[in-house]
């Protein structure tokens, strides 16, 4: 087999890169001139964020994993993550209610105080997506929900490991049932049900505040069901993008319209005490283009 030499590859890349750069530049210019792409607004303060430098992440993947027809713990993965800018605190009740007043958001169900130091709760995935659009329009920056991978990266040592620790080669489903029962019983025994002011649950090593307290956080990651072979390698995968992963003391899949998790909508396990969210500031160069095309942060 003959492989192209390095000079030919460089020439081919150059011939593609220049037109691509011109198209991107022209698209951006047209977008800003036409108002399709957001420019920096002056309608309100930008939320406080933390910046996490690029680094390694080891976490247990989200989803439901099966081998030989039996549920097993999700595999752990090690990846390199790019730097991340994410809200230090969860979105406040006051800020969300301001979005409601300005017509950008749907009124929340829970009658908690509209305070600047109290996280908003009683909001669905759809509500969070509407708020992200409103904040992006208001600030001229792109804000979106984090993926579960991004939230795990930000949460660092506070991110939960939901493994049951059962021997993956065990063919006795009763062992997993008993371990799952003990875990869910322990989760239900340690409840502080009402939202607490900012800072009540401390900060992690990255400066992220209150993660893993009594508020689970929406992510943009869909629930997936993965079938593994005998070597724990994926052989098939199915996503359900009407159900999204929330994370807090443990991970919990919730339907996108659920506002009150204790009232139903959790696929498995103990329901979260409360559900809220925080956003990532998306600084990818193409984020404004995605925003303009889709009409929402992606």
Q: Where are these predicted regions, by residue range?
A:
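Disulfide-stabilized, aromatic/cysteine-rich ligand-recognition loop
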Residues: 2-36, 203, 238-298
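A short glycine-rich, aromatic-capped structural motif
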Residues: 40-107, 126, 213
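Short Gly/Pro-enriched turn/cap motifs at secondary-structure boundaries
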Residues: 75-76, 197-200, 267-271
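Short capping motifs at secondary-structure boundaries
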Residues: 84, 91, 97-108, 135-141, ...
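Short linear capping/connector segments at secondary-structure termini
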Residues: 110-118
């Amino acid at each position: 087999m003959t492989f192209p030499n390095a000079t030919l590859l460089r020439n081919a890349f150059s011939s593609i890169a220049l037109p691509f750069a011109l198209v991107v530049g022209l698209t951006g210019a047209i977008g800003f001139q036409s108002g399709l792409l957001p420019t920096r607004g002056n309608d309100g303060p930008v939320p406080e964020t933390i910046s996490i430098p690029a680094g390694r992440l080891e976490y247990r993947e989200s989803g439901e994993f099966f081998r030989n027809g039996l549920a097993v713990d999700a595999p752990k993965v090690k990846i390199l993550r790019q730097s991340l800018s994410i809200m230090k605190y969860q979105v406040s009740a006051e800020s969300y209610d301001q979005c409601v007043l300005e017509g950008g958001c749907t009124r929340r169900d829970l009658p908690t105080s509209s305070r600047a130091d109290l996280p908003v709760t009683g909001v669905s995935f759809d509500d969070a997506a509407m708020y992200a659009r409103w904040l992006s329009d208001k600030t001229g920056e792109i804000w979106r929900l984090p993926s579960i991978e991004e939230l795990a990266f930000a949460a660092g040592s506070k991110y939960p490991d939901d493994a049951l620790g059962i021997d993956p080669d065990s063919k006795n489903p009763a062992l997993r049932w008993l371990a799952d029962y003990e875990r869910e019983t322990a989760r239900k025994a340690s409840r502080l049900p009402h939202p607490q002011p900012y800072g009540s649950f401390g900060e992690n090593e990255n400066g992220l505040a209150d993660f893993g307290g009594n508020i689970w956080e929406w992510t943009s990651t869909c629930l997936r069901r993965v079938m593994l072979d005998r070597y724990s390698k994926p052989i098939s995968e199915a996503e359900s993008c009407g159900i999204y992963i929330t994370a807090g003391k443990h991970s919990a899949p919730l339907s996108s319209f659920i506002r009150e998790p204790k009232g139903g909508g959790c696929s498995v396990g103990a329901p979260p005490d409360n559900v809220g969210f925080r956003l990532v500031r998306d600084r990818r160069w193409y984020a404004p283009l995605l925003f303009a095309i889709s009409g929402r942060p992606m």
